[in-house]
Amino acid sequence: MTLVYQSTRDENNKVTASQAILQGLATDGGLFTPLSTPEVALDFDQLKDASYQEVAKLVLSAFLDDFTEEELDYCITNAYDDKFDTAAIAPVVKLKNHYNLELFHGSTIAFKDMALSILPYLLTTSAKKQGVDNKIVILTATSGDTGKAAMAGFADVPGTEIIVFYPKDGVSKIQELQMTTQTGANTHVIAIDGNFDDAQTDVKRMFNDVDLREKLLAHHTQFSSANSMNVGRLVPQVVYYVYAYAQLVKAGHIQNGDKVNFTVPTGNFGNILAAYYARQIGVPVGKLICASNENNVLTDFFATGTYDKKRDFKVTTSPSMDILVSSNLERLIFHLLGNDAAKTKELMDALVTKGEYTLAGADKDILDLFAAGFATEDETAAEIKRVYDENKYIEDPHTGVASAVYEAYVQKTDDHTPTVIASTASPYKFPRVAISAVTGKDSGDDFKAVEDLHQLSGVAIPAAVDGLEHAEVRHKTVVAAADMQKAVESYLGV
């Protein structure tokens, strides 16, 4: 039976996986979400010897079950190749107190590569399956990493165009240069005078603008998304949690069947939601620990049941988590409410009109899987230094947040279940922050910090950063948040 994906806001809006990938966001504003848990035969005594590609095929064939075996082989083979600097794709590294699942070995040295390497192939395959020959325009808001990874994936892919919005003062220098130097005739990067939530809100609005949709269709063009609201982004992230567990079994760190905890640095909630789905298909998970920075709206939600975005937006050293409207939480809310679209829509409408909602009648078994905490800027820096002092291993600030939250969780609960931290970016993406945390000194410049980091860590400078300082800046457009649609229409000539 084909797995059904339904909008979180309309029980009558049901589609297949390929239809969900092609649409990106449901026309009613909801997110396409699997109505049931697919059956996956997870035999870790066998999977421990499987390649990343083999695990991907097992997981994706269950979630994307309207794709043929040949179609999935094509997507997986083209996605997980020598774009990654290790054959393991996502290696697990043992540190003194926890394990790091390194998700930054792709072409843009951030975890977004794990899904955005395959999304272009899933999307173009979905278009063929649905008989769609419109130009597909990827419209995306980024808090730093998604934009570059999406452009790297879609650059010069026939039949596609990609437009990325990012907050002008809300990303690191390295992140900004990675985006503004991106090549590819079909890539467009636009800075906005505003924050990530401003960008994401208007991208969602454009997706739901019926007049704009009709205007685009008249030009044989349609939107899709590279954000984690697209299931084509979300489902591939489930793979690496399955793979991580298999690697722990293979290394003898755990026995097959032992529970593990996953600690995930969290902004838009997609990465930790993928860990939840991994648990649902059979990965033995004890706790899912949701780690936030000082934008701790999720910590408060799990503590109180109230989601309240009415608070100051803080710019931190972990910019990919500087988010107050956590889009993918909507999918968890939908599950917590027994897949009730009407109730979910009511809460999401309240978030828009009142700036908050309170969850009532939630599935306690699901809620109890989660723990949540946040780390301040000082706590994050101190944790990066502690991890370095104990392991001679340098974490990026997002991983540092997760590590600090995990340490606090252990202090509070005395839960010493083996724990994997999703290490979401290379420290080379945030070199000044990493060097400052470890040495107490500011390198004064991102590229000086890259050299300092190389000297301190002995880790080779990744190709994604090497040469970036002198690369040509190709994208220089800055617009007001209110003018995002005008910019899109201008680029697309509609």
Locate each region found by the language model.
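PLP-dependent amino-acid enzyme catalytic core
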Residues: 1-494
